[in-house]
Amino acid sequence: MEITDIGGVLCNGIKEGKYGLGLVRVRGSIAGVFTQNKIRAAPVIVCEENIRDGVVEGVIVNSGNANAYTGEQGMRDAREMCRIAANLLGCEERRVAVASTGVIGRKLDMEWIRKKAPEVYSGLGNSVENAERFGRAIVTTDRFVKKAYSEKARIAAVAKGAGMIAPNMATMLCFAFTSAKFDSGELYDMLRRAADKTFNRLTVDGDTSTNDTVLLISTGKERVERDVFEEELCSVFYSIAKQMARDGEGATKVFEVRVDGARNDEDANLIARAVASSLLVKTAIFGCDPNWGRIIAAAGYSGADVDERITLSLSDGRDEVFLIDSGRPLGNEERARVLMEKAEELVIRLRLEKGNGKGFAIGCDLTYDYVKLNAEYTT
């Protein structure tokens, strides 16, 4: 199921080298959540302004240039992107959502965007190929486009994101479309909760982008129960978050940190995020080194209420190796190493003896290729 399987969604895109441009025609209700970085890209500011009344008729996206830290010129360029799309789509400028991703601090090549936008518009359609072209247009260092859907709730989403990913949200753009009928206020409430339970639990490298944008758009053609929709939206976002971790720049392994028995959920999530964000843990995962001391240390500095009564295990989804039992090391490092070498996905499970709090985070290993990719990013 592609985004073009949602009735009323037409899209297209073009990719030339590092630069891409995507366009969507869609009329409906819209909600968005955006970066928590204090340095906010121009398209984030403009997009927030434009979707404030909850109505959308189009989306325009460019990749290769973030249009961030570009001052007043950046704001003018973001608004011009909306104006270009509006003129093509035959709608008001304020009905266009805009997003950008790429290198920070460089001016947009507006001449290229002006030239390519009519070409993209002329190819708008609802085919699988249209959806694929839009997906390719929005990626940067991604190895693949992230996609997920729910037939049950009539949701389809497409996203990009591979590096500069850390709570809150991750460098990510995500565009989710649904034919389920909800107003913008309902969409926002469900979007905010779903993003918090998924994207805000994801960390690749500890950096938070200036451009994070997640948009949820409803064409309002079908009735879906709200509880069902929100549960399915979480599932769609969880799938995309896992794909982002799998595609973390240079990543070879994805892992989840699951915590229970914490004093409360807040503490559990603090611990999970600290472990998932730890560079020492990430490099240990890459090296298949069951150095559980790094995990314990991260739990200890997380800010949560922690003591030595921790039970720690590693699992590949089939087999589980316990390394610590209620504070007592078990000497199972070699068994854990063998499990890590075979696994593509791991679960690090920490059980505390503080209460009933539960939490989780998603991460990936940190490899030599991550350094190489990011050392050469702007060259």
From Swiss-Prot:
Pathway terms, separated by semicolons: Amino-acid biosynthesis; L-arginine biosynthesis; L-ornithine and N-acetyl-L-glutamate from L-glutamate and N(2)-acetyl-L-ornithine (cyclic): step 1/1; Amino-acid biosynthesis; L-arginine biosynthesis; N(2)-acetyl-L-ornithine from L-glutamate: step 1/4
Enzyme Commission identifier(s): 2.3.1.35, 2.3.1.1
Molecular function terms, GO-annotated: glutamate N-acetyltransferase activity; L-glutamate N-acetyltransferase activity
Annotated binding of substrate, by residue: T140, K160, T171, E249, N374, T379
Listed NCBIfam families: ArgJ (TIGR00120), PRK05388.1 (NF003802)
GO biological process terms held by the UniProt record: L-arginine biosynthetic process; ornithine biosynthetic process
Location relative to the cell: Cytoplasm
Protein name: Arginine biosynthesis bifunctional protein ArgJ
Quaternary structure note: Heterotetramer of two alpha and two beta chains.
Catalytic activity: N(2)-acetyl-L-ornithine + L-glutamate = N-acetyl-L-glutamate + L-ornithine; L-glutamate + acetyl-CoA = N-acetyl-L-glutamate + CoA + H(+)
InterPro entries xref list: Arg_biosynth_ArgJ (IPR002813), ArgJ-like_dom_sf (IPR016117), ArgJ_beta_C (IPR042195)
Chief localisation class: cytoplasm
Residue numbers marked as site, Involved in the stabilization of negative charge on the oxyanion by the formation of the oxyanion hole: T101, G102
Function of the molecule: Catalyzes two activities which are involved in the cyclic version of arginine biosynthesis: the synthesis of N-acetylglutamate from glutamate and acetyl-CoA as the acetyl donor, and of ornithine by transacetylation between N(2)-acetylornithine and glutamate.
Family membership: Belongs to the ArgJ family.
Keyword tags: Acyltransferase, Amino-acid biosynthesis, Arginine biosynthesis, Autocatalytic cleavage, Cytoplasm, Multifunctional enzyme, Transferase
Active-site feature positions: T171
Record field: transmembrane: none
Domain of life of the organism encoding this protein: Archaea
Pfam family, one: ArgJ
Family matches, as SUPFAM superfamilies: DmpA/ArgJ-like
Site for Cleavage, residues: A170, T171
Record-level GO cellular component terms: cytoplasm
